[in-house]
Amino acid sequence: MPLSSQTRTRLRATTPLLVVANLQRSIDFYVAKLGFVDPSVHGDPPCFAMLNRDGFDLMLSLAESPDLVRPNGPSGVWDIYLSVADIADEIAALAAPGITIDKGPTDMFYQMREIEVIDPDGYRLCLAQDISGEPLRDCETMSGVLDIGSAKLRLVLQLKSLH
């Protein structure tokens, strides 16, 4: 029998771990380009690092071989989703060190404004701002198949601003 959330200890954080091909290159990217700080590097030679930005931790681990670096792939699935206070500020901050925004900004039907960047190992990072209090601009179309028992329903959503 599963324990209820009232009988479990409270979760306090989640910390992604990215397996990377070149630890120093990844540290440089996340610090210089994405604003992470305080890299705590471990190992001799270095093989692990812990970075932080605004209380959000990120772990980087050096791959023993290149085939162990496994981003979610080119399908557009994110490896990390970061909620930010102001996406316009993030876009401006990313432009300064010359980061290319791979996708966005895009207003999504679930009330988030998102941009995507790709790190040197191909990990796709989505930075997003809650826009639930704003009118939607053109939104991305979302489609999929909803399996409801024996029936399958094809669902296509496209939301646009009424303005």
Task: Please report, for each region that a protein language model flagged, where it lies by residue.
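Conserved active-site tyrosine of GNAT-family acetyltransferases
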Residues: S26, Y30-V31, L94, D119-G122
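Vicinal oxygen chelate
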Residues: P2-L17, V37-A85, D89-I118, Q129-L159
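N-terminal first-folded block
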Residues: R25-I27, V31-H42
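Hydrophobic ligand-binding cavity/cleft-lining segments
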Residues: A21
